[in-house]
């Protein structure tokens, strides 16, 4: 319970299929950095997530690369090098919305929610 979850849509952070941050990402990342500075007491987890399009291994690799990009930006641009970051990719394994409808149709709105990066800040040791 002693955590803050920041969820940032991959659409804000990255172009389709990319792990290089877009300039539209910076204000969200600056606000995340402020929360980290104000609240973090312990490790900060950064987890990349994808939707179910593409192969499992591709999505795993992409989600890891995206999480690393966020960590690297926070360390370099927000000067958070004193904090310990645990970076991981979850691929398509932890959707927050269904990737398909009950009828088996594609669910673009659900998939959009699923490709994201989560920053989990521990607020007590």
PLM regions: where:
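Periplasmic peptidoglycan-binding/tethering modules of Gram-negative envelope proteins
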Residues: 1-43, 123-125
């Amino acid at each position: 319970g002693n955590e803050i979850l920041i969820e940032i849509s991959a659409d804000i952070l990255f172009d389709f299929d990319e792990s290089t941050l877009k300039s539209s990402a910076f204000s969200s990342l600056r606000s995340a950095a402020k929360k980290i500075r104000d609240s973090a007491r312990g490790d900060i987890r950064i987890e990349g997530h994808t939707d179910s399009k593409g192969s499992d291994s591709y999505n795993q690799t992409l989600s890891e690369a995206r999480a690393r990009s966020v960590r690297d930006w926070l360390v370099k641009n927000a000067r958070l090098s004193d904090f310990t970051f645990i970076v991981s990719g979850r691929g398509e394994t932890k959707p927050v919305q269904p990737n398909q409808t009950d009828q088996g149709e594609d669910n673009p709105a659900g998939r959009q929610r699923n490709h994201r990066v989560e920053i989990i800040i521990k607020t007590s040791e």
